[in-house]
């Protein structure tokens, strides 16, 4: 996985997530939408309408009054995904 910031402002972030597909992008988007201060989170695998699939571009918009940096929100969402995976691993191990 390689990340490349395309655009960043106080309330918006667009970042390319090279090497990932819909599976991962849906998980991180879902975690972002549950993160405090995030107004919107989307991704596109064909942002330039090039006629073919490109690397996914994740777009995050935070609420202007929330004082949340979109990059910090992405970090929070990533940690939440890790916590969920750890919880699942523990539950799975206990079940088998």
From Swiss-Prot:
GO terms for cellular component: cytoplasm; DNA-directed RNA polymerase complex. Keywords: Cytoplasm, DNA-directed RNA polymerase, Nucleotidyltransferase, Transcription, Transferase. It comes from the Archaea. Its main location: cytoplasm. The keyword Cytoplasm applies. Its EC number is 2.7.7.6. It catalyses: RNA(n) + a ribonucleoside 5'-triphosphate = RNA(n+1) + diphosphate. One of its GO terms (biological process) is DNA-templated transcription. Coiled coil: none annotated. It is found in: Cytoplasm. GO terms for molecular function: DNA binding; DNA-directed RNA polymerase activity; protein dimerization activity. SUPFAM superfamilies: RBP11-like subunits of RNA polymerase. Gene3D superfamilies: RNA polymerase, RBP11-like subunit (3.30.1360.10). Part of the RNA polymerase complex. DNA-dependent RNA polymerase (RNAP) catalyzes the transcription of DNA into RNA using the four ribonucleoside triphosphates as substrates. Belongs to the archaeal Rpo11/eukaryotic RPB11/RPC19 RNA polymerase subunit family. This is DNA-directed RNA polymerase subunit Rpo11. It comes from Haloquadratum walsbyi (strain DSM 16790 / HBSQ001).
């Amino acid at each position: 996985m390689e990340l490349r910031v395309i655009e960043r402002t106080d309330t918006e972030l667009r970042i390319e997530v090279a090497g990932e597909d819909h599976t991962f992008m849906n998980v991180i988007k879902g975690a972002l939408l549950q993160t405090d201060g995030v107004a919107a989170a989307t991704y596109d695998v064909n942002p330039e309408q090039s006629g073919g699939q490109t690397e996914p571009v994740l777009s995050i918009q935070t609420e202007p009054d929330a004082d949340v940096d979109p990059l910090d929100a992405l970090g929070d969402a990533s940690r939440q995904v890790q916590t969920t995976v750890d919880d699942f691993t523990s539950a799975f191990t206990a079940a088998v």
